[in-house]
Swiss-Prot record:
GO terms for biological process: glycerophospholipid biosynthetic process; phospholipid biosynthetic process. It comes from Mycobacterium tuberculosis (strain ATCC 25618 / H37Rv). The gene is pgsA1. A CDP-1,2-diacyl-sn-glycerol binds at residues 31-34, 72, 76, 82. It catalyses: a CDP-1,2-diacyl-sn-glycerol + 1D-myo-inositol 3-phosphate = a 1,2-diacyl-sn-glycero-3-phospho-(1D-myo-inositol-3-phosphate) + CMP + H(+); 1,2-di-(9Z-octadecenoyl)-sn-glycero-3-cytidine-5'-diphosphate + 1D-myo-inositol 3-phosphate = 1,2-di-(9Z-octadecenoyl)-sn-glycero-3-phospho-(1D-myo-inositol-3-phosphate) + CMP + H(+). The keyword Metal-binding applies. This is Phosphatidylinositol phosphate synthase. The active site is at 93 (proton acceptor).
Amino acid sequence: MSKLPFLSRAAFARITTPIARGLLRVGLTPDVVTILGTTASVAGALTLFPMGKLFAGACVVWFFVLFDMLDGAMARERGGGTRFGAVLDATCDRISDGAVFCGLLWWIAFHMRDRPLVIATLICLVTSQVISYIKARAEASGLRGDGGFIERPERLIIVLTGAGVSDFPFVPWPPALSVGMWLLAVASVITCVQRLHTVWTSPGAIDRMAIPGKGDR
């Protein structure tokens, strides 16, 4: 979860726990909720953002991102999740994040025609995946790879706020998208460096590895 107090697990638990119990009673599983939330989030991002409906797209994506958090609450109510569920949730998060940046990239590239902003968006798209991969690959090797400025909640807050404010009804501020995207791009690159440094300083990180055989590749 985020380091921000108002995005803490405890803060959301007050809202999500009763809803999670209700969903479990009607027979839904955490994995089904994960897939439904991701599907809706991706559909909203890839439909509304390319049409230039940035405020509506930001609201839809944010709603279903919050909806997707119900799967964790449901798993806790059932006494714990499964390893497959954890992998599915992480995979769907990457798909959802990718859809957000791809939808915005389409609008920026083909309608705004802002080349510098295209570059910033591409940086955000790539680093959003790399940040998560560094942690996953490090933990698979028994090392630490967490921390850094930007985690998923902060990433979504920055990009969705920038998109929404740039197209806000009645009082839009168009530069907000560019400001948010460049801020996120810089912070994301720094986070990649921070996480790599965390991996490098982990115990055993520079120990030599056995050379894999042909059958291991």
